[in-house]
Structures are given as structure tokens and as C-alpha cells.
Amino acid sequence: MKKRALIVLAALVLASCTSRKPASPPAPIEPVPPPVTVSVQPPPPATSEPVPMPPKIKTIDWQASLSPLVQQMLAVEGINDGSVLLVNTMKNTTNGSVQTGKATAALTRLITDAGGKFQVVGANQLNAARQMLGLSADDSLESRSKAVGLARYLNAQYVLYSAAAGDVKQPTLDLQLMLVQTGEIIWSGNGVAQD
């Protein structure tokens, strides 16, 4: 029995061995001829149309446009000298793009240069407060209530809310001075932006 098992095992081992086929001769290596270089002439440049000029951005003289309104606001009686004022970012409700950052900066500069009527909240302090309250510096949904809330956070007595409205070529400027404690509008003025 052991002999048979041994013979069967040997037969299986031998059957599983494959015999090698005779190796075929290696394929002959043929040299590749060098590539033929063909000089290609670049196509003549296509005549291109001139690039159209971008539309000119209408520049507004913010100093001249806002100065009369600021003078009217500074003439309001009942405001203590040195009161803290938050100049809110100008809101754009025109039919186009208005440089509200420049307008707000000009408005702040006019009030600061006017003397000691108001102590204007600085830009760094304003930006820090906006971050703390989760408001974006470029908040397109700016509202009077947000402006008053921001002013309360900064302990300002007054807020100057401003907006540019109408046609972007000559927007109407609306300014409102609000008492933070009550939200009451104590002065408002409007004018047309000048070139």
C-alpha cells in the first residue's frame, strides 16, 4: 500500500513538471534609421482684432459731494463736543458699482478734519468689533439696526448711516445721523454726487 501511494505520488510529481520547449532564437535587432528632420514654417500670425477698452470707471469727487452734507450735519444743535461717532460703511443701492470704501473714507476724513464736534471711531477698532460680532467688512446687507448694534458695542453715542442710491452715473447720497441710545434719526440730508 505504501508502495502504491509512493508510486502515485511520484507520478503526480512527474506529471506536474513541464518540459521546457526549445528556446526560439532571439529576434534580430534591426537598426532604426535616423529621423528625417523636416523644417516646419510657422504659420503667419493671424490678424487679431484690437482688444476692446474696458469701460471707464466713473470717478466721483467724494470730498466735494459730501462736504456740504457734513457741514449741515455739524450745524445740528444739541450734540456735545467730543461725542463718539461711528461712521458706518456707505451702502450701495445704485444700479451699478460705486466705490463705497472711498466714499466712507472721505466722509470720515471730512468729519475728523472739521474739528472737535465728533470723535470718530477708528478703522482698526471698527474692524475688530465687526469680527467680534461676526459681521463682514463688505456686508452688502448693511442695515440701520446692524449699524446701531455695532455702535452700541463700541460705546458710540451717534451713528452716521449713509447710502448711495439711484443711477450709478450720478447717485443720490443720503446721510442720517442717529442717536444710538434710542435709534432716533436726529438729522438727515441728501445730495447728488459730483464728478
From Swiss-Prot:
Composition skew (Pro residues), residue ranges: 23-51
Alphabetical keyword list: Cell outer membrane, Cell shape, Lipoprotein, Membrane, Palmitate, Peptidoglycan synthesis, Signal
Keyword Translocase recorded: no
Location(s) in or outside the cell: Cell outer membrane
Membrane topology: Lipid-anchor
Gene Ontology molecular function, alphabetical: enzyme regulator activity
Lipidation (N-palmitoyl cysteine): C17
Disordered: region residues: 19-51
Keyword presence, Membrane: yes
Lipid-attached positions, S-diacylglycerol cysteine: C17
GO cellular component term of the entry, any: periplasmic side of cell outer membrane
PANTHER family hit by this protein: PENICILLIN-BINDING PROTEIN ACTIVATOR LPOB
Family stated for the protein in its record: Belongs to the LpoB family.
Subunit structure: Interacts with PBP1b.
Protein name: Penicillin-binding protein activator LpoB
